[in-house]
Structure formats: structure tokens, C-alpha cells
Amino acid sequence: MFNFLFSNKINQYQRIVKQINSLDSTYNKYSDQELKQQTNKLKDQIIATQDIDTILPKAFAITKEAIKRATGLLLFDVQLIGAIILNQGKIAEMKTGEGKTLVAMLTAYLNSLFNKGVHIVTVNEYLAKRDATLAKQIFEYLNIHIGIIDQSMHSQERKKQYSCDITYLTNSELGFDYLRDNMAIQKEDLVQRDFFFAIIDEIDSILIDEARTPLIISGPANNKLTEYLEANKVANLLNQNTDYEIDEKNKNIILNENGIKKSENILDINNLYDIQKPWIKYILNALKAKEIFIKNKDYIVKNNEIVIVDEFTGRIMEGRRWSDGLHQAIEAKEKQKIQQENKTLASITYQNLFLLYEKLSGMTGTAKTEEAELEQIYKLKVVEIPTNKLNQRKDLSDLVYKTEYVKWKAVANECFDMYQIGRPTLVGTTSIEKSELLAKILKELQVPYNLLNRKPENITRESEIITQAGRKYTITISTNMAGRGTDIILGGNPQILAKTALTIHINKILNLTQYNTNYKIENEITYILNSINNTLLINNIDINSQDISQSINNIINNNMIQDAKSYKISNIYKIVLNKYKQLCHNEKQEIITLGGLYVIGTERHESRRIDNQLRGRSGRQGDLRSSRFFLSLQDNLLKIFGGDKISDFMQNLNIDEDMPIESSILNKSLSSAQKKIEAYFYDVRKQLFEYDEVLNNQRQAIYIERKRLLKSNYTRDCILEYAESTIEEMLVTYNQQTDISEKTKILSKILKLLNLNIYINNNILLNMEENDIKSFLFEQLRITYDLRESYLEQLRPGLIRQLEKYYLLQQIDYAWQEHINKISILKESIGWRSYGQQDPLIEYKNEAFNLFINMVTYIRQTVIYLTMRSRLIVNIDN
């Protein structure tokens, strides 16, 4: 019986699962062609009825059969339940190793039958490519086309991939393509369809961890760069506590009175807060760069550039820059070339991006701790899926040491002990710097290790390292969750091992390319390879490393063998694979007797969920495993929340420095501290959402109007509509005036704006009724526009339509960019309203609305002015 929190629904899920499984005997008798034909039948059925629930059992059973034929895997009932939950627009919480990749395919196939496109969103390109490759093999049996969005693709290729039934892509590529589509000048440049259904893998990482970071497309702004250098000099002359304080909880700097005066003296200015030249933002950013943003933790220096490191995943974020001058401050600190500060051209948060979908769901192993936020903001319920086998992971109590030095020594000694007995160990660190510190200590202890952090030189080996982290005598150091999404299999992954060994061996004996001389191939495998060396390898002609790698990949992926050479290599691969399967199985049994994979955490994160992600690397498919955190009172979390008190307590008890504290009370205190931080960041994200919702509504209004104009082939009506609206708006002001001279000025402004070159008889116009003036101006507008259209058509047919669209899109884009900047300034300053007993959010909404109305008015008037009054330079030769 499934152990469900949602026990009242279990019978409903079991009933559907039984229906799906009952169809196995039907579909396993179908030929490949008959199975493929089922897709069109289901499409016809779903289009006719629009009832997805009725065909769900059939669709899942068909996909289940395709998975079995392509991979040989039989889906567990819990995977079917996970897919049902995804189809209901909920989040399926499934533990590591439970087969989330295949679960997503079931739901994706069902929803692809609507012919509207399904997006499967992953956190990085490696996972997107890996999953898309597997999906192509499976859906080849069902006549479903799989797309993959690659960072290097041009727009036409992207358009083709988005038009597929199911498209795999990263969250950042999805967001940037959305923004680029809403900046396109030609409708042919649009790559995306309307958003229909998305399944987000590691949904908590995207919707929670990255919620505070908006996606931004930016362009250069004209700012001076010397201020950053000057501010960096000032920051280095200021001292903590005497001139400023660090707010570690909020990651902020508080400049005190002494620091303000000292800064003003150094800069030789009277006011650090002068509105005309506010130095304060440069000084605060320089101090943040000095004290809060740490090299090899928050960023790395790569090719003379500052590259951000994601605080949650440890991944480097190429192309991303901190805004508001912070990135420039860090460039000044690191003595790198300071790049021009950018202005925002388009932006959107992941919160609002994914709310654009008609239907949304996701998967993760850790969502329960953020359940309230996911439901409140995204209307997504979290359903915990039971594991297929009983979870045998043992989470040991935290060990807390007095200093960081002692903690790292203890971690290294623990790794040494595990290496001595052969137990595979995964150590999670919070920064690149700390991962390299541990690596250095292990090197001194002569303990071999694999280093998995997001430094560029280590990225290429990420999947190889994490895949083999479950082998005997393997110590793996991983920065945060680098390698997340790749299973750690006890005893090793025989497919990867066989491919690697075969590729290295062939490269070596044929002297084709450089090979990894440090990679150790087992004696049994080397014997097999050497025994078939002469007969099957040397006689092959024109083998190169690409052929070898591709041939082996084709076998792993069950692709067709196309030539005799590949066929020979495939036979060798199968022999090596079978031997590795035997070796890995035997090794797994030995590791289980040692206690399974051992996961060591070296610092508690601000979120319990991130800790759980690290722990979750152990306990795959019922494997015996354990985890433990090694902490110190100098860790950030403990330093902020009572580390000094615990240190005094240890001092009073005369506890030896090398002796750790192991206490359930301390564990509860740490969990309590994490809950406080989680609550704080939840409030931050909630506030961000509330404020961004205002801008999002305006963004949608602008983007809908822009797309309507972009796709339109006839924009004359829009121009006239803008002109008539402008006339009406200006006549409102005209009718409110009592002064004749002011009324005359307004009429003159209208006529000038619309290029209505007629003689104004003040007495006649001023004595007209409101509706008569409006009718008269509307009539003159159309006459003048007809004349201008006729003139431009004589110059070149279709020219007027091109000009209309160009002016419309150009002015919408320019006005929107300026509007974003004004909204950003408004958001920064609005907090001060709370001191005047005003609700900042209400004030923000009111002022943002006024700014939006002003922007719309500006767009209309500028487009009309350019269309009616611009002069064209005619090229006589063309």
C-alpha cells in the first residue's frame, strides 16, 4: 500500500494506474507501425472531445510501451502516479533516482496531442540535451517530434525546434527567447508559439531560488566609469565598525556618520547624497564588493571578466551581470576592465514568465518545505510521491566544531577513513574556494579525489565525475549541487564506463588523439580489449575519434548500425559492457556492506531545501546510504544566529577544540534559524512578486499591442486610431480651459502635431461646439493622411505601411525602455513613503499607473508626429 499524505486520493490514483496497466497486454502485441498509428487516432479523439482525462490511460499505456521498446525499462506504478499528478497541473515531489525524466515524458506525450506544443524546462543545457536524446529514441515509436533549444542556435533553427510537439530547453533560453520575440522588428523573426503547457524539472530551483533574479536584455548606457575606481579607493580606506557595519542577514552595508564624513573628505565633496551627483550608490557598491561578494564563492575571474556563480547551484552564469553598478564595483575591486553600465531594454522575472502558460506543472525531490509559497504565488499544489522501494538513508546528527580550521581537518580525516575502507564519499561545499581548500588538505593526506566545481576546467567532466561517484575508493568534492540531475549509482554506471574505456583504448592503440593517461581501466577490461585488438581494430581503415565516439553512442542509444566498421565496434562494446555490468554489480554489493554512499555536508545553507538536496544524493532506489553535516561556529549561518553564545558555552564547559558538539537541541536551533531565513526570503520574493505584478500587467498590455501591430499587414487604422485618441485627449484639456489664449495654443498644438496646414479662424473654431470641433479635426486628419499616403505610394508602393510599422515598433520599444528605467527608480525610492505613514505598495501602484498613462500618451503623440511630419530623403538612383 502506498504511503501517501494525500491518502484520500490514493484510491483514485490506483484506479487509473490499474486501467493503464490493464492495457499492456493489448499494446505489447502491436507492431511498431501499429503503435505509431495510435498517436493520430488519439489526436483526432482529443480534438473532437477536448477531454484529456478520458484518453489518459490509453496515452500513458502507449508511452509506457514505447519506453519499454526503446530502453527495455518497465515503469513503476509510482511513476505513473507522478505523471497523473503532473497532468493535473501540480508539483510531483519525487526523490532522487525515482525516474523523473520518464515521468515527464508520459505527461508531455498526452498534452502534445493538442498540437499546441509542450515545453520541458531544465536547469542546464546538459540535462536538456541528455533528456532530449532519450526522448527522441522513445518518441520515434509514436511519431512525435522532439525539439531541443541550444544556446548557439540562430532564430530560424529555434523557430523549427519550438514548432516540435515536445521541446526541451533551459529556463534562461525560454525567458530570453520570450523577451527577444517581444523586441522583434519582423514577424518572421518570432520563434515561439503561444505558451500552452510546461513541465519544469527541479521546479523549486527555478521558481524559488531564481525568483529574485530577473531575466534582463540590456544595452549600453552612457555612464562615466571613473566613479567606480574612485569609490573603490574610498572603500579600501574605510574600516568596518568605525566607518560602516555589515548587515549579514540582509547582505547590506550600513554607512555611519563617521564613514559619511570620511568619504566626503576623501572625495572633496560637500554631500555624499547630492541628487545631481549621488556618490552614495558608488560607495555602498564598492563596500559590498569589498566585504560581501567574495571571489571564488560569489564570482570567479575568467578571461579577465567577472563571472557570477549561482549561490544555490554553484554553477557559473555566463553572460549574466549584476545590475545597478554592482558588477562594475567588483570589476574595479579585481582590477579588471570596467565595462559600461547597461540600461534595461526588456526584462521579466521567472515568476511572471511561467504564469503565462495555460497549464503548468513540475518535478523536484525537495518542494515540501516551500509548499505554501508555491501554492500562494503559482497556484501549484505539491504532492509527495512515495518511493518505489523503502528509503534506507540514515541522516546522522550534525557535528559542530569550534573553528573552521578544525572542521575542515575533521572532514578531511573522515574522507581519509572512508578511503581506507573503500566507501564512496560525496562532500558538498558551499563555494569553489572551500572545495579547493579541502582538495589541498586531501592531497597532503595522499587521498585521491575528484573535484567537481563550476570552474571552467572542471565543467566538461561534470557528468563523468558525478556518474562514477558511487564507485569504491572514490572521494568526490562537489560545490553545492553541481552535477544535480545525474544519478549516482553504487558500483558505477556500466554504460558510461564501457564507453569511456573503449574510446580511450582505441585512441591509444591507433594514436589518433590525446587520451586521458590518468584514467585507470580495470585489468579484466584491458585483457578483453587486448585479446580482440589485432583481429577487430587494426584492420579498420580511416577510423577517427569522432567515428569511435559516435559508434559507441549509437549503440548506447539503440540506433541503427550503418556500416561494417561500426558493427565491429558495437560487438566489442557489448562484450565490454557485459563485463562491466558484472563488475559493477559485484562492486555494488561490496559497497552496501560498507554502508553505501556517504554524503558529507560542510555547511548548513540558508534554506533547509538545499541541505535536503545534498542529502538526497544518497538513498537512490532503496540503496543503503547515510549523510552527516560537519559544521563550525564560524560558518555564516551559525555566526549570524548565536554562534558566539555556543562558543562561550563550549568555553565554560572546557570542551576541547578538536571535540565536536553533537546535540539534538543544537540541530533544532539550526533548523529554527533556517526557518527564519526562509521566512525572510519568502517575504522578499512575495514583495518582489507584488511589485512586479504591477509592471507585469503593463508589460502584457504593451507586448500584446506590439505583437498585434507586428503581425498586422495593415496599420493605417492603428495610426488613425492613435491620432483620434490624441485629438480627444487634447480636446479634454481644451474644454477645461476658460482663457481664450490658452484654448488657441491647444488648437495650434493639435494642428501642428497632425500636420493640418489650414488657416485657423479663431472666431469660427473657438465658437464651435465640442463635438463639432472633434468632427472637423477628424475629417481634416483623414484628408491630410490620404494625401500623404498617396504621395508616399508614388515614391514606392507599400512605403507608407513600412513607415507606419517602423515608427510604431520603434517608439513602443523606446518608450517601454524609458518606462522600465523610471519604474526602477520609483521602486528604489518608494520605500521612503512608509515613513510618511503611507502604504508603499499602494503609492507604487498609483504612480506606476500614472507613468504608464504618460508613456502611452507619449507613444501615440510621437508616432503621429513622425508619421505625419517626417521628411523622407529620396535616393534617385534607387
Swiss-Prot record:
The keyword Hydrolase does not apply. The lineage of its organism: Eukaryota, Rhodophyta, Florideophyceae, Rhodymeniophycidae, Ceramiales. PANTHER family: CHLOROPLAST PROTEIN-TRANSPORTING ATPASE, SECA INNER MEMBRANE COMPONENT OF SEC PROTEIN SECRETION SYSTEM. Coiled coil: none annotated. SUPFAM superfamilies: Helical scaffold and wing domains of SecA, P-loop containing nucleoside triphosphate hydrolases, Pre-protein crosslinking domain of SecA. This is Protein translocase subunit SecA. The gene is secA. Keywords: ATP-binding, Chloroplast, Membrane, Nucleotide-binding, Plastid, Protein transport, Thylakoid, Translocase, Translocation, Transport. InterPro entries: Helicase_ATP-bd (IPR014001), P-loop_NTPase (IPR027417), SecA (IPR000185), SecA_CS (IPR020937), SecA_DEAD (IPR011115), SecA_motor_DEAD (IPR014018), SecA_preprotein_X-link_dom (IPR011130), SecA_SF2_C (IPR044722). GO terms for biological process: intracellular protein transmembrane transport; protein import; protein targeting. CDD domains: DEXDc_SecA, SF2_C_secA. It is a peripheral membrane protein. It comes from Antithamnion sp. (Red alga). The keyword Mitochondrion does not apply. Its main location: plastid. It comes from the Eukaryota. ATP binds at residues 79, 97-101, 487. Its EC number is 7.4.2.8.
